[in-house]
């Protein structure tokens, strides 16, 4: 019996992760605010009450559902940093109400798989080593807040993955293991098949 934290989004959950990881296209500037609401709408619609207008990010279907998400724009040598801290505020808010919580995140491999390469021809999987330290930082900060369960959604496990992506799962989750943090790896839409 947990209250899930991390499943709310003003616009979409993939966009929340892009903001959290600092994956904001240069055309939108580098300044983020405490809540990033205006930035979210500039990314989604190209305009908001504050900031300069810019072409909106591409939107596409989340797998084969009718849910649409903003596609992360990944560039060669993409840097990732913990740039949006709303998740931790949401954890504290739920804890203050006395509820046991479980945090939910999109997994690093699904996040990269669902992104799109801009500015050159490169393999998205090459960005995994730069993204994993941000996940590790998130997990460490959640543990410091007393969180003991994190659900990590990896729906790409239901796809026919190339061997390089399959192998990356073991490598990634070996690095993300924490003794005092239970990771609930989830997938949906279909079975694991050969994954």
Region roles according to the model:
Residues 1-195:
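Domain-level signal for soluble alpha/beta catalytic cores
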């Amino acid at each position: 019996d947990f209250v899930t934290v991390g499943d709310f989004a003003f616009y979409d959950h993939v966009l929340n992760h892009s903001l959290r990881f600092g994956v904001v296209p240069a055309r939108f500037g580098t300044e983020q605010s405490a809540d990033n609401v205006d930035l979210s709408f500039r990314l989604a619609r190209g305009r908001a009450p504050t900031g300069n207008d810019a072409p909106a990010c591409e939107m596409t279907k989340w797998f084969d559902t009718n849910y649409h998400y903003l596609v992360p724009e990944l560039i060669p040598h993409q840097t990732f940093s913990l740039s949006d801290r709303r998740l931790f505020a949401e954890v504290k808010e739920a804890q203050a109400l006395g509820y046991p919580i479980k945090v939910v995140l999109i997994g690093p491999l699904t996040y990269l798989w669902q992104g799109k390469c801009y500015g050159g021809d490169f393999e998205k999987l090459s960005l995994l080593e730069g993204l994993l330290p941000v996940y590790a930082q998130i997990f460490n900060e959640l543990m410091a807040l007393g969180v003991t369960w994190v659900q990590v959604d990896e729906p790409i496990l239901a796809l026919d993955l190339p061997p390089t992506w399959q192998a990356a799962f073991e490598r990634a989750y070996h690095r993300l293991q924490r003794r005092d943090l239970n990771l609930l790896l989830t997938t949906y839409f279909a079975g694991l098949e050969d994954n």
